[in-house]
C-alpha cells in the first residue's frame, strides 16, 4: 500500500507538471477538464464521449435533448477515460477548466446522481459561470471550499460514483458542465416549492444550475481563438420562447447585469416587469425591462412567443406546451420562472 504522504507528493508533482504544461499553451477562457482532447478530431467523437450503452451513439454522451428519443435532457458532457489501473478503474486526473474558486464539493456519492462532485466559480470577462465535475472517485486531498484554483490545476480523479445506475468500467467518464446560477435564494424556494423533498446541496443543487453546451463553447473557442467571447456566445443562444414576468427585483438581474438590455421607456416611466428570452434549457439570455404602459396583461407570467422549430428540435425541458392552436407555459416552464424570479 502506498503511504499517504507519498500519495500527496504524487499529487504535488502532478499539479506542478500540469501548471508547466498549461503555461506553455495559448491562454483561452476554458480548457479541457481531462487529457482527452479528441473532440477536436473530426470523426473521433466516439473516443471523446461516453455513450449510455454499447448500442447507443456517442451523441447520448453529449449535451442537450440526446436521450430517450430526444425527450430527456443531458445537461453536460460525459468525457471518456484514457487510462485505468490494473482493476480497470479510471485514473485520469481531472483539472479545473479555468481560473476560479471552489464553491462546493460533495464527497457523499449516495446523495446525488453526480456522485462525488465539485463546483467551481469562474469570472470570464466579468461574467460568472460555474463548472461542475461529476462521478469523481476522489477529490484532491486538502482541497477547500473558497480555495482559488488555476486553469489546468489538478482537482480530482475520474471515477464512477453515482447514486443512480452503476456506471460500467468501459464508459467511465467525468460528467462536465458549464452553468449559469439561477437564484441565490434556491434553498428557500426549494423548501417552498418542493415541500417534503430533501435538498442536500443547498444552492449547488443541480436544479439551480442552468447548463450551456460545453461542446459548443470548446469548439467555438478552438475555431475563434482569441476572438471568442463568452458573453456574445450566451447572447446569441437560439430562442425557444419569450416570456413576460411581473417581477422587478430578483437575484439574476444583479448577477448577470450584462444580459439586461436597455429600454428608454422603462428608464423614463419605471420598470414594471421584464421580457425574457429563454433558450430550450431555460437559460435566460436576454432580459428587457418593460414599463407598465408596455405590458398588456396582469398575469404574473405571460408567454409572448414560441419558436416552434426550436421546440420541435429540442423539446426535452418541456417548458411550453401546445393545446389546440395555442401555446402555453407548461408546468416545468412555470416552475423555472418561479425559481428565476423568487
Describe the function of each predicted region:
Residues 1-7:
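N-terminal secretory signal peptides that target proteins for export/translocation
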Residues 11-21:
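Bacterial N-terminal signal peptides
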Residues 26-116, 199-342:
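Surface-exposed, glycine-biased beta-strand/turn segments
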Residues 80-83, 131-140, 160-165, 195-201:
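Short helix/strand-bridging catalytic loops that position acidic/His residues to coordinate divalent metals
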Residues 89-91, 97-140, 169, 173-175:
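Zn2+-dependent peptidoglycan hydrolase active-site motif and core
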Residues 97, 143-144, 149:
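Surface-exposed strand-loop junctions at beta-sheet edges and helix termini
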Residues 112, 117-120, 147-225:
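Conserved, short, structured surface segments that act as functional micro-motifs
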Amino acid at each position: 500500500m502506498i503511504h499517504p504522504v507519498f500519495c500527496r507528493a504524487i499529487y504535488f508533482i502532478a499539479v506542478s507538471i500540469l501548471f508547466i504544461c498549461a503555461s506553455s499553451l495559448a491562454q483561452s477562457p476554458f480548457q479541457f477538464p481531462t487529457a482527452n482532447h479528441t473532440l477536436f478530431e473530426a470523426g473521433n467523437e466516439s473516443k471523446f464521449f461516453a455513450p449510455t450503452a454499447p448500442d447507443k451513439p456517442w451523441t447520448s454522451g453529449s449535451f442537450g435533448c440526446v436521450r430517450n428519443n430526444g425527450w430527456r435532457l443531458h445537461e453536460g458532457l460525459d468525457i471518456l477515460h484514457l487510462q485505468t489501473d490494473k482493476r480497470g478503474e479510471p485514473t485520469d486526473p481531472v483539472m479545473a477548466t479555468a481560473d476560479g474558486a471552489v464553491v462546493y464539493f460533495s464527497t457523499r456519492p449516495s446523495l446525488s446522481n453526480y456522485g462525488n462532485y465539485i463546483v467551481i466559480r469562474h469570472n470570464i470577462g466579468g461574467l460568472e459561470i460555474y463548472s461542475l465535475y461529476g462521478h469523481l472517485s476522489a477529490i484532491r486531498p486538502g482541497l477547500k471550499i473558497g480555495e482559488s484554483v488555476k486553469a489546468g490545476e489538478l482537482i480530482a480523479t475520474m471515477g464512477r460514483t453515482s447514486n443512480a445506475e452503476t456506471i460500467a468500467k468501459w464508459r467511465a467518464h467525468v460528467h462536465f458542465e458549464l452553468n449559469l446560477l439561477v437564484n441565490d435564494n434556491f434553498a428557500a424556494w426549494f423548501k417552498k416549492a418542493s415541500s417534503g423533498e430533501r435538498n442536500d446541496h443547498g444552492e449547488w443543487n443541480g436544479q439551480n444550475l442552468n447548463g450551456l453546451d460545453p461542446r459548443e463553447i470548446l469548439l467555438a473557442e478552438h475555431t475563434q481563438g482569441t476572438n471568442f467571447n463568452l458573453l456574445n456566445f450566451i447572447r446569441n443562444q437560439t430562442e425557444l420562447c419569450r416570456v413576460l414576468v411581473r417581477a422587478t427585483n430578483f437575484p439574476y438581474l444583479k448577477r448577470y447585469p450584462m444580459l439586461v438590455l436597455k429600454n428608454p421607456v422603462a428608464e423614463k416611466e419605471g420598470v414594471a416587469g421584464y421580457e425574457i428570452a429563454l433558450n430550450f434549457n431555460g437559460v435566460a439570455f436576454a432580459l428587457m425591462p418593460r414599463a407598465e404602459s408596455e405590458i398588456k396583461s396582469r398575469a404574473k407570467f405571460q408567454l409572448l412567443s414560441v419558436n416552434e422549430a426550436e421546440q420541435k428540435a429540442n423539446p426535452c425541458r418541456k417548458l411550453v406546451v401546445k393545446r389546440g392552436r395555442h401555446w402555453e407555459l407548461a408546468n416545468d416552464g412555470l416552475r423555472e420562472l418561479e425559481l428565476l424570479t423568487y
